[in-house]
């Protein structure tokens, strides 16, 4: 499935790798097989991942810029969680804050996975699949959904990703991300040129919402 940012700017998965790892290559062993498949578009999520990352302009903390070894040696129990937040300048120019260690890179991909789960959970016919603590069932459901989108929109190459506002606007997106597992409301809104309609007992694949601020 071809994809484009607002303004029809084409993107590719290879650019994602360069955006996330601009300083030096990161060995593939730091990625799970799922992440590896995503980066190589084996499950057709690579382009979507790239667009969501760039559109959200996630900032994963402002920790020390020292060597990767220094951070990796820290005790995990003493390490404060790195929670994504919206960087206003990054949002304006649609750029990424690059994680500077393998651990932060993995946290980036995990956070994006959480956003995908949040945006797709409302379409699940059997919510028991979300009881799997390791997330495998959730991820399989996401893959099924996006495979359906890819099959139905082969000739539809224009869609747009925007942020859904919280009660206080886009600057409070952090609160939305933290509460996604409880509300099951989509954090992301996608307007496709052709929407896949579910039957009357289910909502549409991805709910279209009015956004607080446009990215174009």
From Swiss-Prot:
InterPro entries with a match to the protein in the record: Y'_ATP-dependent_helicase
Family: Belongs to the helicase family. Yeast subtelomeric Y' repeat subfamily.
The protein's name in its UniProt record: Putative uncharacterized protein YEL076C-A
Organism: Saccharomyces cerevisiae (strain ATCC 204508 / S288c) (Baker's yeast)
């Amino acid at each position: 499935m071809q994809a484009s940012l607002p303004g029809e700017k084409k993107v590719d998965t290879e650019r994602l790798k360069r955006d996330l790892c601009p300083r030096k290559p990161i060995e593939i062993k730091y990625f799970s097989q799922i992440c590896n498949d995503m980066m190589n578009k084996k499950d057709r999520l690579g382009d979507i991942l790239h667009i969501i990352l760039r559109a959200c302009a996630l900032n994963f903390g402002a920790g020390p810029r020292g060597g990767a070894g220094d951070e990796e040696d820290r005790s995990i129990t003493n390490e404060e969680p790195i929670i994504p937040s919206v960087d206003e300048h990054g949002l304006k120019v649609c750029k990424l804050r690059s994680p500077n260690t393998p651990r932060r890179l993995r946290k980036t991909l995990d956070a994006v996975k959480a956003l995908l789960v949040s945006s797709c959970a409302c379409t699940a016919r059997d919510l028991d699949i979300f009881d799997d603590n390791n997330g495998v069932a959730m991820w399989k459901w996401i893959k099924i959904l996006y495979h359906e989108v890819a099959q139905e929109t082969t000739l539809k190459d224009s869609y747009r990703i925007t942020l859904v506002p919280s009660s206080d606007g886009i600057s409070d997106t952090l609160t939305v991300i933290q509460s996604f597992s409880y509300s099951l409301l989509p954090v992301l809104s996608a307007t496709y040129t052709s929407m896949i309609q579910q039957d009357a007992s289910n909502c549409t694949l991805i709910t279209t919402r009015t956004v607080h601020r446009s990215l174009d």
